């Protein structure tokens, strides 16, 4: 997906990028490739692939969820900033917090946000399990995560951070439907309920994606998230 097709596909979905936003995505790509030579941020570096598999893919939740109605987003394990930085470019009013366990990635994100002239961005070096126990617990309108872990694990890392009435939006791959079935037990225990599971195919390569919208119906029990590593080793399964 070249830049023109990127803009065209977004326009078809009702998003017309300003010159400034287009420039931000161009700088994002250049900065990503430059830093990727020093630290491992992504295996995808070809320009057309980055625009499709990182930038466009990160924006897909906005086809189904109105981010104009929310203010704060927490992105768990965003790596090189996906999906929250592309969403921030699209919706400049958003206040985003990214939690990542690798300090090198946090350094990259700090540099990137300065290059893109982004404001109201916070980058936290922490494990999601620890972060979800502290002052930010149940404080975000939306929590996002993309391809970090299976949904049964991811729910324990993300739902504790969502305020009651807020949303956990997970970007999942081809196994999205199976993961939802497997994750229903964990989602319920953690205070969530599945609102929608939107299937879509990425343009050009036609690969399957699912955008999962989980609403936080009740507070998460205090025992969750469990200590670092436990959700992955012992997922909440029926």
From Swiss-Prot:
InterPro entries reported in the protein's UniProt record: rRNA_ssu_MeTfrase_G, SAM-dependent_MTases_sf
Signal peptide (residue range): none
UniProt keyword list: Cytoplasm, Methyltransferase, rRNA processing, S-adenosyl-L-methionine, Transferase
Keyword Cytoplasm: yes
EC numbers on record: 2.1.1.-
Pfam family, one: GidB
Region (Disordered): 216-238
Domain of life: Bacteria
Binding-site positions, S-adenosyl-L-methionine: 77, 82, 128-129, 146
GO cellular component, one term: cytosol
Subcellular localization: Cytoplasm
MF terms in GO: rRNA (guanine-N7-)-methyltransferase activity
PANTHER family: S-ADENOSYL-L-METHIONINE-DEPENDENT METHYLTRANSFERASES SUPERFAMILY PROTEIN
Record function comment: Specifically methylates the N7 position of guanine in position 535 of 16S rRNA.
Protein family: Belongs to the methyltransferase superfamily. RNA methyltransferase RsmG family.
Protein name (database record): Ribosomal RNA small subunit methyltransferase G
Organism: Macrococcus caseolyticus (strain JCSC5402)
């Amino acid at each position: 997906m070249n830049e023109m097709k990127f803009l065209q596909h977004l326009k078809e979905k009702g998003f017309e990028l300003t010159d400034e936003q287009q420039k931000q995505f161009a700088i994002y790509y250049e900065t990503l490739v430059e830093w990727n030579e020093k630290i491992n941020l992504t295996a995808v570096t070809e320009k057309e692939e980055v625009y499709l598999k990182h930038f466009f893919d990160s924006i897909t939740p906005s086809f189904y969820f109105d981010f104009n109605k929310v203010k704060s987003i927490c992105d768990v394990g965003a790596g090189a900033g996906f999906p929250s930085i592309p969403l921030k470019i699209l919706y400049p009013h958003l206040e985003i917090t990214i939690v990542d366990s690798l300090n090198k990635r946090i350094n990259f994100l700090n540099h990137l946000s300065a290059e893109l002239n982004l404001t109201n961005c916070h980058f936290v070096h922490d494990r999601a399990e620890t972060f979800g126990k502290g002052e930010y617990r149940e404080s975000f309108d939306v929590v996002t995560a993309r391809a970090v872990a299976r949904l049964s694990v991811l729910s324990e890392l993300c739902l504790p951070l969502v305020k009651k009435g807020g949303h956990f939006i997970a970007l999942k791959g081809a196994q999205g439907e199976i993961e939802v079935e497997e994750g229903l037990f964990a989602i319920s225990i953690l205070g969530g309920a599945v609102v929608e599971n939107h299937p879509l195919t990425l343009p050009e390569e036609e690969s399957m994606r699912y955008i999962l919208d989980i609403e936080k119906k009740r507070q998460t029990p205090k025992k969750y998230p469990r200590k670092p590593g436990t959700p992955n080793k012992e997922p909440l399964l029926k």
